[in-house]
């Protein structure tokens, strides 16, 4: 239910006699006859809609115009590869824009549960205000599977403001190297399209890894840019040549040490790159974005007890507590779902969890209240989570 902040409709007064307005007020400052008439008209409408506000009815008619919740309307769905689609979205009026390389979180309702996932914004500069995200279908991925199989043009999705530090520095004075693998190409494509659209004279080399040529997302556009001389493109097909070994960069990109490098892809690839740049003493020239946590062998699992709502779930050792909880209808805080933002952190009063990225086990004795990231933690025995 929606409720007004002031059921009497009266406004508090400052010592000067002027109304005090809070964030819930929908009025403009008084001063002209026109604004007074608007205020009176609004008050009349407000009387008819109580206890809702007029804006709540606007939300029903046009959900993109609400000032309280950010949503987007799907304008177009484009098939990129067999398992990748690009979704073009018209964000609501409260969208604050984004920097190339950032991501937005998209929320959809699946079986009565709202699930969120982070997707990189892949569109370049546009005059129509639309943005695009590119989604690769993941085996067992609830949201990516839903978007591929059920999303339709015209559908409304939940959104959050853009986030992320995988962006070009404002004062960049070096040539650029983009090292990407699989769907890790998506934030790099957002950067690349921006530099091309803005007519920036930037020396860019992209080395992209994918299993086969037909698995390369944006392949046609990348090849066109390479033919135009806007990009030096190197493709590595891992089914044939295996994963990239960083030592190969000396022959593939001889001047890589002079370039600012942006890397995004599987965790194993990023770990090797970080170690290589560290050994070379150039770690500050490498910016990484991990789009999917690296999982280790499943543990034994256990019973998770959410103490405040008194609900117990049997959790295996292969999946995050967050995912299992949401599927069971438990409303849990969440964020990036990659172990980066700490938006999912909850206190563990007692028990043990295993970090799915590293295999490290975190334990809590009775009453400890150890903070755990539920998006990358699996049950490693019985545990109690304060929620």
Residue ranges and their predicted role:
Residues 1-84:
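Short, low-complexity N-terminal leaders and the immediately following helix N-cap/first helix
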Residues 1-29, 36, 145-310, 314:
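FNR/FR-type flavoprotein reductase catalytic core
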Residues 57-156, 160, 173-175, 202-203, ...:
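Ferredoxin-reductase
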Residues 122-125, 316-322, 360-363, 378-380:
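A short, sequence-level motif marking secondary-structure junctions
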Residues 187, 330-355, 366-381:
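Local cysteine-cluster metal-coordination motifs and their immediate loop/turn environment
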Residues 239, 316, 377-387:
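Short flanking/linker segments adjacent to small metal-binding domains or redox-active Cys/His motifs
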Residues 300-334:
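N-terminal pre-ligand scaffold of iron-sulfur
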Residues 325-328, 355-359:
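Short Cys/His-rich Zn2+-coordinating modules
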């Amino acid at each position: 239910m929606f409720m007004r902040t002031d059921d009497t409709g009266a406004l508090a007064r400052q010592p000067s006699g002027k109304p005090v307005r809070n964030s819930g007020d929908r009025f403009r400052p008084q001063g002209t006859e026109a604004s007074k008439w608007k205020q009176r008209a609004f008050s009349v409408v407000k009387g008819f809609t109580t206890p809702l506000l007029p804006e709540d009815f606007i939300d029903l008619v046009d959900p993109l115009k609400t000032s309280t919740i950010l949503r987007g309307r799907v304008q177009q769905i484009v098939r990129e590869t067999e398992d990748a689609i690009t979704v073009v979205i018209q964000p609501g009026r409260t969208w604050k824009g984004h920097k190339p390389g950032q991501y937005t979180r998209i929320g959809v309702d699946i079986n009565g549960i709202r699930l969120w996932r982070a997707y990189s914004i892949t569109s370049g500069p546009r005059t129509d205000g639309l943005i695009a995200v590119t989604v690769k279908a993941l085996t067992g991925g609830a949201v990516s599977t839903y978007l591929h199989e059920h999303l339709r043009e015209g559908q409304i999705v939940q959104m959050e403001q853009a986030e992320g530090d995988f962006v070009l520095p404002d004062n960049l004075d070096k040539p650029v190297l983009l090292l990407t693998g699989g769907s890790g190409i998506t934030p790099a494509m957002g950067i690349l399209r921006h530099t091309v659209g803005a007519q920036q004279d930037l020396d860019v080399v992209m080395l992209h890894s994918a299993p086969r040529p037909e698995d390369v997302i944006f392949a046609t556009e990348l090849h066109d840019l390479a033919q135009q001389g806007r990009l030096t493109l190197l493709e590595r097909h891992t089914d044939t040549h295996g994963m990239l070994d960083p030592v190969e960069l000396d022959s593939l990109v001889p001047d890589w040490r002079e370039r600012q490098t942006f890397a995004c892809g599987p965790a194993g690839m990023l770990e090797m790159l970080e170690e290589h740049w560290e050994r070379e003493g150039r770690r500050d020239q490498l910016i990484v974005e991990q789009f999917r946590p690296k999982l280790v062998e499943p543990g034994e699992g256990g019973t998770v007890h959410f103490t405040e709502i008194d609900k117990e779930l049997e959790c295996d050792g292969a999946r995050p507590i967050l995912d299992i909880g949401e599927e069971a209808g438990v409303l849990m805080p969440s964020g990036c779902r990659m172990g980066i933002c700490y938006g999912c952190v909850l206190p563990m009063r007692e028990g043990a969890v295993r970090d799915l990225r590293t295999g490290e086990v975190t334990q809590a004795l009775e009453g400890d209240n150890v903070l755990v990231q539920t998006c990358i933690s699996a049950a490693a025995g019985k545990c109690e989570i304060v929620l």
